[in-house]
Amino acid sequence: MITFQDDPTTRRQNWNCHLFIEHRGCKNMTDIYEKVSDYFLELASLQRLNILFKLLERNRKRIEPLAKELGATKQEVHRNLVRLEESGLITKEKDGKYSLTTFGKTMCVEIPSILFLSQHNEYFQEHDFGDIPLKFVMRAGQLATGSHIKGITKTLQKWKSVYSNANEYVYEILSEIPEELFDPILQKIKNGVKFEYIVSESAIVPDGRQTRLKKSGFYELLENKSIERKMQKSVQVVVVLNEKEACIFFPKNGVADLTEMFYSDNDVFHEWCLDYFRYRWYNSGVFQEHKLKE
């Protein structure tokens, strides 16, 4: 089940979301919900959705090429074009070509969020968005291109590949520090890759970590700013990214779950993960070694 953390911040965000859809001049929320439900009804058609996205790909099309691309009759497509036009999602130009309105374009941008959640509905029966701020949840459609990877062996393998493919940087938000990932990231840092990470105060760390860090030259890399690190109270959502690809692990029962991830090298997916990392980095505190227990 998709849930949100029940804390003051999240409750305030949910209230703000409720206020967001209110506006002056409406009698009550029922009127707004009724209007929204009417628009959902217009979108509850595979052909009408296809028409919208065909127009998004290439704005301004006549009915004939649309019907051909959709493999439908002109009469059938015309009927759906009329419905979309009446709802304000598209408009018909004087030359007979159809194009998306601002409203129609915006709806196409919002649909990927529904697509992402519906495509991975089974996954989100057990996982949730944890402590992700609402403003990022509202951008969940940017994650729609992500591939779902399941199994700790496969997720760690993909994690290592993100390290391997990095040429500029690796950024991470960590709930634990997997021992098998230490050597791969250290080698990349020594080859000039910038490493920044945020770790939970309660992070699980391998035995002998301190000794290994000293022998590896980790602290010298930290001194010359090749490595920068911060700390936050807890980490529910784990993120790993380089300059061109990213992974995200959502929590299960409020705890970070490294056995399943979403991965993509799509620019929009990467942008979401990078923005989220920067948000957490800005709001994280100073790294305190004594809080990590081996």
What are these regions (language model features)?
Residues 202-240:
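HKD-type phospholipase D/PLD-like phosphodiesterase module
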Residues 161-217:
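Primarily the HKD phosphodiesterase
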